[in-house]
Design a protein with these regions (language model features):
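Helix-start/capping segments and mature chain N-termini
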Residues: 1-88, 111-339
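Short, flexible active-site-proximal loops enriched in glycine and acidic residues
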Residues: 53-54, 91-98
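ATP-grasp fold ATP-binding core
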Residues: 98-105
Length: 339
């Protein structure tokens, strides 16, 4: 009897089947390509355990419902599918790797193409799994060096035009903000978008907080995505007896702040120490941020900063000094000497 072969590449859940990552393909006629018509979530683990997975999946279901995408699957079933993908891929992960899930729900074929192309009409549920280190290892220095907050000319799309609480792939305004920051002369810059009234909203995939007089302030949530990590900051702050206030914040409030930080799933929270190159507060990582990141690390049983730094030690790319954690700008190519 021939023993079953072990997977040699990561496995993806694709519409009820487990397929090799290289074989998970969408049709060129899918609405995802036509309109960015996708509800999605991205998660991470700590010590191999998924963090707030149910909350992410509940938001995924809500986003799909708002978009009229018929995702006919319970949160419990989605959890099972996610855990199956992780179990399939764990043998290919290093012992210190964390699992970063990427869960996409596309509408499927546009009605124009239904019954005209020989493929299922959709919707499509795709669950991919890759090492967290890909996302954070080249930006680990931000935990100690801090972020330079930059407000681009691109504005946040207000809730009166597009519901921001729906997490979807149609994020061209994020892309335009990052394109602008790719020409920023400073380093470690992350974009912070303002709304049409000039109030602070969110980063391109992150929420934002400032600290003043030992109180945490964050933009009121009408015009932003209410992040899972944002909610967890509220939980930690309550346990630490730190007041959190949601209110309209202006760029002036950021310049006058004692500390600032971003929250997002892969990084948890990252300090911001400059605003357009000028120091925020003392211009270094502050005590309230330090309390929060230490508490977060204790709760999940992982030293978040040390883990990122350990990943950085294995990187072949070096520091991501560009404008976003996703290295939007291409690194400069070194000219080779001619003989």
């Amino acid at each position: 009897m021939i023993p079953p072969q072990k997977n040699t590449q990561r496995i993806v859940y694709f519409n009820g089947s487990m397929v090799p990552e290289s074989e998970a393909r969408l049709s060129i006629y899918d609405s995802a390509l036509m309109f960015g018509d996708v509800a999605f979530e991205m998660t991470r683990s700590f010590n191999k355990k998924q963090f707030k997975l149910r909350e992410h999946l509940e938001r995924l279901i809500a986003s799909a419902k708002w978009l009229h995408i018929p995702l006919e699957m319970s949160v419990q079933k989605l959890e099972v599918c996610c855990q199956q993908v992780i179990a399939e891929n764990e043998p290919l992960f290093a012992p210190d790797d964390e699992h970063r899930l990427m869960i996409n729900v596309t509408r499927g074929l546009l009605g124009l193409y239904a019954n005209r192309v020989q493929i299922p009409s959709g919707p499509n549920l795709i669950i991919a799994d890759f090492p967290l280190r890909w996302t954070i290892q080249d930006s680990a220095h931000l935990y100690t060096d801090g972020i330079d907050v930059v407000i681009p000319s691109q504005r946040m799309i207000p809730a009166s035009l597009l519901e921001p609480k729906v997490k979807n792939r149609n994020r061209i305004h994020y892309l335009m903000a990052n394109i602008e920051l790719s020409n920023y002369k400073g380093k470690n810059a992350w974009a912070l978008l303002i709304d049409p009234d000039g109030f602070l909203t969110e980063g391109t995939g992150s929420n934002f907080f400032i600290i003043k007089n030992n109180r945490i302030y964050t933009p009121e949530p009408r015009n932003l995505l209410r992040g899972i990590s944002r909610d967890y900051v509220f939980e930690l702050a309550k346990e630490l007896d730190i007041t959190v206030i949601e209110k309209n914040l202006e760029p002036y409030d950021l310049m006058a702040a004692d500390e600032a930080f971003f929250s997002c799933t892969p990084f948890s929270i990252v300090p911001a120490v400059r605003f357009h190159g000028r120091e925020i507060g003392a211009g270094k990582v502050g005590p309230i941020y330090t309390k929060l990141i230490n508490s977060w690390s204790q709760k999940v049983g992982v030293d978040i900063i040390a883990q990122a730094q350990a990943y950085a030690a294995t990187s072949t790319l070096g520091l991501a000094l560009g404008p976003t954690p996703y290295q939007f700008a291409e690194p400069e190519k070194k000219s080779s000497a001619t003989s």
